[in-house]
């Protein structure tokens, strides 16, 4: 799968294929009514002939191993129309196609003159590795109209329910330093068209620019350290940052960032998950404690649920690479173990990074802790109080 392929960026010295474990498979039926209020990208402006009726869906994903794309589609019965673009380019490419009753998709892309330049063919199906079972993904092959240059693609629906003129617009930091031998490719979201989200924009921008600066500083120090010389043929250091929107409403934004960094000369890279949970109404970044009643043992409740879920998973899947000793330490009721939490409609989406509960090759592990398991602890008038009712 393409989500698995993204990890290749961090294993360049050995070109090892890394399997992202614990992907819980979901029934392969087509779901048309999921997230019908999704807001398209800031660049989305329907081209001539695009349908004006139907349900709108916003997707993020990749073509090939690492060509990221944003896609906005309008689904009207069997008809699909919309646009997609590459964040590092920013130019819309028109889309028009069909979807049948079994979810088989064929979408042609065309240039400004109407000439077809490519075709997406794949399957519209429930998303895997998603905290919300009603979200969808489209997976398949992109090719030129004649079938050449065939490349795998995967795009996942984003749960955007922001009203008004506000639109998500990805920003890209891309840098290559040949002298210091590092490359940076980092994305972070901005919300255009509504001043309510200005503080969120500053927080998201600051989070990623600081991480990029820290990476560059570390590379500069490493490069000047005479005891840290590496052969010229070794792969350059890299920092790659991508994100998923876990929740986006007028009041709350939850963004999950995946940061993959590789230090020149290392056996493999590292993967770190950072989540920005932002209270738009009150203009502040949320701490996990903000969701719960005073003195509530929320860490104990979250820990207990995650331990049971991961133990069940390990019993059912002998190839899961989950490690009992790692799990004992990595799921204990300590704040450090639950730094990567995201807000969703269904519950708190907890991410355990590699080596926290499983081997590196297993990839990050995910647990959705439903609000029903935390209902008695959640602050009724707090940020997620309405979800827990």
Feature roles, as predicted:
Residues 2-10:
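Bacterial N-terminal signal peptides that target proteins for export
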Residues 19-22:
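C-terminal motif of bacterial Sec signal peptides marking the signal peptidase cleavage site
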Residues 26-34, 38-79, 83-389:
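Compositionally biased intrinsically disordered regions enriched in Thr/Gly
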Residues 10-16:
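Hydrophobic helical h-region of N-terminal Sec-dependent signal peptides
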């Amino acid at each position: 799968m393409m989500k698995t392929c993204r990890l290749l960026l961090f294993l360049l010295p050995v070109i090892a294929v890394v399997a992202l474990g614990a992907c819980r498979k979901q029934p392969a039926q087509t779901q048309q009514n999921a997230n019908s209020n999704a807001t398209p990208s800031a660049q989305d402006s329907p081209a001539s002939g695009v349908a004006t009726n139907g349900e709108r869906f916003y997707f993020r994903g990749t073509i090939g191993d690492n060509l990221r794309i944003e896609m906005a589609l309008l689904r009207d019965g069997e008809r699909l129309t919309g646009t997609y673009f590459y964040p590092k380019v920013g130019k819309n490419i028109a889309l028009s196609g069909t979807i049948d009753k079994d979810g088989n998709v064929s979408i042609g892309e065309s240039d400004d003159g109407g000439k077809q330049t490519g075709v997406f063919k794949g399957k519209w199906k429930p998303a895997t590795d998603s905290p919300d079972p009603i979200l969808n993904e489209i997976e398949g092959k992109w090719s030129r109209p004649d079938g050449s240059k065939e490349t795998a693609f995967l795009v996942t629906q984003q749960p955007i329910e922001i009203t008004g003129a506000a639109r998500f617009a990805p920003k890209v930091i891309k840098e290559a330093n040949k002298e210091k031998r590092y490359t940076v490719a980092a994305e972070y979201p901005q919300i255009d068209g509504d001043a309510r989200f200005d503080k969120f924009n500053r927080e998201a921008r600051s989070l990623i620019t600081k991480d990029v600066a820290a990476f560059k500083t570390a590379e500069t120090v490493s490069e000047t350290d005479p005891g840290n010389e590496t052969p010229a043929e070794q792969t350059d250091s890299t920092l790659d940052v991508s994100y998923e929107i876990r929740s986006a409403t007028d009041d709350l934004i939850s963004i999950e960032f995946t940061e993959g960094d590789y230090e020149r000369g290392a056996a493999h890279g590292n993967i770190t998950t950072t989540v920005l949970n932002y209270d738009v109404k009150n203009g502040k970044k949320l701490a996990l404690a903000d969701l719960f009643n005073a003195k509530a043992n929320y860490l104990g409740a979250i820990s207990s649920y995650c331990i049971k879920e991961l133990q069940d998973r390990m019993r059912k899947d002998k190839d899961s690479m989950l490690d009992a000793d790692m799990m004992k330490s990595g799921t204990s009721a300590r704040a450090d173990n639950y730094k990567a939490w995201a807000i969703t409609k269904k519950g708190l989406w907890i991410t355990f990074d590699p080596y926290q509960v499983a081997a590196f090759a297993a990839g990050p592990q995910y647990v959705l802790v439903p609000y029903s398991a935390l209902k008695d602890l959640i602050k009724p008038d707090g940020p997620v109080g309405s979800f827990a009712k």
